[in-house]
Amino acid sequence: NLMQFELLIMKVAGRSGIVWYSDY
């Protein structure tokens, strides 16, 4: 599921302090 994948990315990115997913 793409939705779950995006949530996973946000969780990992937030933990790492990355905000590259904010472009979505």
UniProtKB/Swiss-Prot annotation:
<keyword id="KW-0964">Secreted</keyword>
<keyword id="KW-0442">Lipid degradation</keyword>
<dbReference type="GO" id="GO:0004623">
    <property type="term" value="F:phospholipase A2 activity"/>
</dbReference>
<protein>
    <recommendedName>
        <fullName>Acidic phospholipase A2 4</fullName>
        <ecNumber>3.1.1.4</ecNumber>
    </recommendedName>
</protein>
<keyword id="KW-0443">Lipid metabolism</keyword>
<comment type="similarity">
    <text>Belongs to the phospholipase A2 family. Group II subfamily.</text>
</comment>
<keyword id="KW-0378">Hydrolase</keyword>
<comment type="function">
    <text>PLA2 catalyzes the calcium-dependent hydrolysis of the 2-acyl groups in 3-sn-phosphoglycerides.</text>
</comment>
<dbReference type="GO" id="GO:0005576">
    <property type="term" value="C:extracellular region"/>
</dbReference>
<dbReference type="GO" id="GO:0016042">
    <property type="term" value="P:lipid catabolic process"/>
</dbReference>
<keyword id="KW-0106">Calcium</keyword>
